[in-house]
UniProtKB/Swiss-Prot annotation:
Role of this protein: Catalyzes 2 different reactions between oxygen and the acireductone 1,2-dihydroxy-3-keto-5-methylthiopentene (DHK-MTPene) depending upon the metal bound in the active site. Fe-containing acireductone dioxygenase (Fe-ARD) produces formate and 2-keto-4-methylthiobutyrate (KMTB), the alpha-ketoacid precursor of methionine in the methionine recycle pathway. Ni-containing acireductone dioxygenase (Ni-ARD) produces methylthiopropionate, carbon monoxide and formate, and does not lie on the methionine recycle pathway.
Protein source organism: Delftia acidovorans (strain DSM 14801 / SPH-1)
Cofactors: Fe(2+); Ni(2+)
PANTHER family: ACIREDUCTONE DIOXYGENASE
Site feature May play a role in transmitting local conformational changes, where: 98
Catalytic function, reaction form: 1,2-dihydroxy-5-(methylsulfanyl)pent-1-en-3-one + O2 = 3-(methylsulfanyl)propanoate + CO + formate + 2 H(+); 1,2-dihydroxy-5-(methylsulfanyl)pent-1-en-3-one + O2 = 4-methylsulfanyl-2-oxobutanoate + formate + 2 H(+)
Native organism taxonomy: Bacteria, Pseudomonadati, Pseudomonadota, Betaproteobacteria, Burkholderiales
Family named by the database record: Belongs to the acireductone dioxygenase (ARD) family.
Sites where the protein binds Ni(2+): 93, 95, 99, 138
Record GO biological process: L-methionine salvage from methylthioadenosine; L-methionine salvage from S-adenosylmethionine
Official protein name in the record: Acireductone dioxygenase
Cofactor: binding details: Binds 1 Fe(2+) cation per monomer.
Known pathway: Amino-acid biosynthesis; L-methionine biosynthesis via salvage pathway; L-methionine from S-methyl-5-thio-alpha-D-ribose 1-phosphate: step 5/6
Family annotation (InterPro entries): ARD, ARD_bac, RmlC-like_jellyroll, RmlC_Cupin_sf
Molecular function terms from GO: acireductone dioxygenase (Ni2+-requiring) activity; acireductone dioxygenase [iron(II)-requiring] activity; iron ion binding; nickel cation binding
Amino acid sequence: MGALASHRVSDADFVAAIGVQWQHRPLAPEPGLAALLAQAQLDDGGKATVVQAVGMLVVDECVAHGYHSMDLVVLHPGTPGLDEALERFDKPHTHADDEVRYILEGEGLFGFFDAGGQERVLRVQPGDYLRIPAGVEHRFTLTATRRIKALRLFADTAGWVAQYTQRPAAAMEVPA
């Protein structure tokens, strides 16, 4: 357990040095919310319920950083076009606006690049909150579970258009 803890500390130092905010904010146990998050798929009403419940927890961040909207992204093996989307997400890129993810269920991998081109891969799991500042080079994929539910915060969806950097990158490896 000690090795994992020290690995996460070094990961935290790496991402902090490039401006990424990475915090662990476990959700308080709430039976109704837990039941929704346990479902593989959610209809629009289910998504709206999750956004309303979890959105209350991030109001301060919305005010502090000018985020005007939020939604819930739900990826699972049955998501139409999942493989094509993951292929796009996995290419190193930046955005004109911050990218904010609050992981509620499932897990994924974010790869972050420093100015020297070194990449650090982080596994994100429920309770992880990431704020990736505009211009930080990164990429994303799902783990073998191929499931994630994440609250997304944004100021302007146009700022989320990926600007691909053309950096060659090997397959992301799951950190130990």
